[in-house]
Amino acid sequence: METPHIPVLLEEVLESFSRVPEGYFVDCTLGYAGHSSEILKRYDHLKHIGIDRDDEALAFSKKRLEPFRDRSTLYKGTFATVLPTLKEAPVTALLADFGVSSLQLDKKERGFAFDSETLDMRMDANAPLSAYEVVNTYPKEKLEYIFDTYGEVRSYKKLASAVVDARAKAPIESAKALSEIAKGVIPPGGKIHPATLMFQAIRIEVNNELGEIEGLLDAIEAKHYEGEVVSLITFHSLEDRLVKNRFRKWSQECICDPHAIRCTCGKKHALGKALSRKPVTASKEELRVNPRSRSAKLRSFRFKSDS
């Protein structure tokens, strides 16, 4: 079976789970099962749960994981909603890769690519909100907010005005047309396409990506297991900040008010510890083979174990 997506930081992810005990491995962003298939091959003491909201990805992964059908179960939905409902236990390894898959980026009908003839960007094709609605119906002030907050676009006001001016003449029907608007506002240059940050912002809005990550972290915090390792791959600073701050919170022994004169909590409140101080990034070899890995950052956290 031809693999449409190269999993990022694969060896580093595998290594992060090298000491997990017997139990369930949950892939919260199953995609095309690149990480899952390799983890199932290497760690035969783990059973597998895959979660995704993309029907196409689930159908592909079901076939790809057929050799492991006795150890694998797939669920459709967002990870923030599915994870709290899982009955399978104990979960000893959990992975989430928050990037958009290469297949989604490359398939023009999905509307993620800069030259797509559609304007969609939905991870779940049945979801009510698409990029078309965001671009063509959101008021200028709301576009400014998402371009600034989710895309960290410097010229967010100019960009929002350009979008509103363009759609006043005719609806913006394609990602390609939207890219041209960005090119007219943001000068070319540097390593990324002028529309990159705008597309990121719209995609985050359409799929509630930051809200989903917060929901996942809340679900993990509410229900985790002894010795469980959580490995999360982020692709931009907004995602990484959420993960870094939550891992820092989970690592804190003291939960007293920062302004307290002395500690009264006993300093025994850490849930576990991060496996590395800084995020793990792609090697030079991986960057050569898969340039899309350049923005990937892996952070891993191990919950405490009595043993």
Swiss-Prot record:
Reactions catalysed according to its record: cytidine(1402) in 16S rRNA + S-adenosyl-L-methionine = N(4)-methylcytidine(1402) in 16S rRNA + S-adenosyl-L-homocysteine + H(+)
SUPFAM superfamilies listed in its UniProt record: Putative methyltransferase TM0872, insert domain, S-adenosyl-L-methionine-dependent methyltransferases
Family assignment from sequence similarity: Belongs to the methyltransferase superfamily. RsmH family.
Keywords: Cytoplasm, Methyltransferase, rRNA processing, S-adenosyl-L-methionine, Transferase
Function: Specifically methylates the N4 position of cytidine in position 1402 (C1402) of 16S rRNA.
Gene3D superfamilies: Putative methyltransferase TM0872, insert domain (1.10.150.170), Vaccinia Virus protein VP39 (3.40.50.150)
Location in the cell: Cytoplasm
EC number: 2.1.1.199
GO cellular component, one term: cytoplasm
This protein's name: Ribosomal RNA small subunit methyltransferase H
Main location: cytoplasm
GO biological process: rRNA base methylation
Enzyme class label: transferase
UniProt-recorded Gene Ontology molecular function terms: rRNA (cytosine-N4-)-methyltransferase activity
Pfam family, one: Methyltransf_5
Organism of derivation: Sulfurovum sp. (strain NBC37-1)
